[in-house]
């Protein structure tokens, strides 16, 4: 059973985008603080009424977000 739900964050021209790697969830926001709120809400709504065990997750999984940065070279 997985204990984390993985999310990749990328930066667009105007917004940050969070894409869940484990579920079909995508959201965006103008700030990282708002993005954190949005991704929690989107994942919560996606999982509503679902069995976490059937999806391969342990009870109360955490969200692990990784931010993709532009190359420095």
Can you name each region flagged by the protein language model?
Residues 5, 16, 25-27:
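Structural detector for hydrophobic anchor residues on beta-strands
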Residues 23-33:
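A short, exposed loop/beta-hairpin motif centered on an aromatic-Gly-Thr core
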Residues 8-20:
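Short aromatic-glycine-(Arg/Gly/Cys) micro-motifs in beta-strand/loop hairpins
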Residues 17-19, 28, 37:
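Short acidic, gly/pro-rich beta-turn/loop elements at beta-sheet edges
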Residues 1-8, 33-73:
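Short, charged, surface-exposed hinge/linker loops at domain edges
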């Amino acid at each position: 059973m997985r204990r984390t739900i993985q999310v990749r964050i990328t930066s667009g021209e105007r917004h940050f985008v969070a894409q869940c790697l484990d579920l079909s969830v995508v959201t965006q926001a103008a700030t990282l603080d708002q993005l954190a709120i949005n991704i929690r809400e989107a994942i919560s709504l996606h999982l509503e009424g679902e069995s976490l065990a059937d999806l391969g997750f342990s009870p109360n999984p955490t969200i692990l977000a990784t931010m993709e940065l532009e190359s420095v070279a």
